[in-house]
Amino acid sequence: MPRYGIAIDSTKCVGCHSCRVACQNQNGLESNETFNWIKNKNRGQYPSFDKEFIPLQCNQCENAPCQRVCPTGATYTSPEGVVLVNPKTCVGCKYCMEACPYRMRIIDHQRGIVEKCRFCIELVRDGGTPACVTTCPTQVRIFGDLDDPKSDISKFIAETGAQPLRPDLGTIPKIFYKRS
């Protein structure tokens, strides 16, 4: 079974939010809801001012704190290694939201449940890739099997030295970043 991950080359991100819109469309989210965020980071001072855009999403942690604190087992890891939420057993207690050190979950107030990025698992199981990956005009994201040394994602990580956010937390994220 593959161990899926995403590598993000934030040096290519132009902050267009195509990933966010594709995610919203794929997941039926409202315009004020998203599983993808773009953090804007200012660098330098005028006149040598620059802006870095950092795409953020659930890190699909192998040691997921959100999963450990879920009292109903609604947060679980799929056979593909994707951290998911079962909407039928989620009671909306928000323990998982508090436990996530990356703050990458949202509450669906209408349904009273917590939601998060699912790596578009329905597309992946049909041989596709997540919507945020396919829609990006600058190919910021690379999706693939982290355990396959010949995969594009593994090659990218090896060649660029891409790292997860906050490896010191011990969550073992499956999202890797190349930053400037």
Language model segments and positions:
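Non-ligating segments of multi-cofactor redox enzymes
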Residues: 1-180
